[in-house]
Amino acid sequence: MIKLLHLVDNSLQSQTAAKCDLLIHIGTSKLQYAIIDKVRDELKALAEYVLPEISNLNDLIFAIEKLPECKREFKYPFNKIRVSFDSHKFTFIPEELYENEKEQEYSKYINPSTSDLILTNRIRSAKIKNIFAIDTIFNAGLNQIFHKPRIYSQATSFIEGIKKTNPDRNGTCLFIDFHKNHIQIACLKKSDLELYNILECYNADEFNYFLLSVIEALNLDISNCNLIVSGDVASENDEYYQRILKYFPTPVFSDSKLIVNHPEMFHNIIPHTYFSLLSLGECE
């Protein structure tokens, strides 16, 4: 893997890891991880790697196992290890309607393959259950690499993050999280979750179409709607951002410093880039 970022506080040692959580996101093109000191509520490590071209899940697991962290940091006795991955196979059930014995019935909504395992996360702030599929080989690989990881789909962390940092709890907010080949998009109205989806998106024209479709479907008054962006997007020379400005003249960037404190060594990090990763720390 190609290393894009690797910042680690020198005070992070095996003997201090018990007060820390390890957060890992495995995307379609990148692997990111962070280590959070839960006692001091501050960031201790942040790293990002480009994933190699892979043809199957065994190759992905092998690539992760080859990371130097698998022989060092990932072996530390952390308080909790949380791992998220990108999945289009998910559905939400309100907590008041959810019944454990009906999990397999709920899973029919996501059309799992025969090799999939069904997992469930609670999205506490939205009072919903997130039911999603993970390939059994991938699940077994994660449990082999990491010690008792809690596994999430990307939806859980993103929703927990936007609920925590919602800038207008009595208004309407549209959140868009950009990645190489997809976007996450969510809407909160008076703090209630109105919409969440993950969409394959390969160019600005596709994004423009999705944005207009969401505006129309939710009947959004864009003059009274806050737009918050995160992920791989910039305010200059970014075609996606220019499309946003056509409809929302004053978008704002999410701020991961509202999730966890960033000591001085992390001050050069663009706060919105790792918003979804750091929001994993808000998950149960």
PLM region spans:
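Small-residue (GG/TT-enriched) beta-loop-alpha framework at ligand/catalytic clefts
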Residues: 2, 30, 122-220
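Accessory, usually C-terminal, subdomains that scaffold auxiliary metal cofactors
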Residues: 198-274
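Short glycine-rich, Thr/Ser-proximal phosphate-binding strand/loop in the N-terminal lobe
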Residues: 28-57, 191-205
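Structural motif
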Residues: 26-28, 83-88, 179, 229-234
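Short glycine-aspartate micro-motif
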Residues: 21-25, 82, 173-177
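N-terminal phosphate-binding loop and adjacent alpha-helix
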Residues: 46-73, 205-219, 223-226
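N-terminal basic/disordered segments at the start of proteins
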Residues: 1-40, 281-283
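Active-site neighborhood for divalent-cation/phosphate handling
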Residues: 36, 44-53, 62-163, 258-261
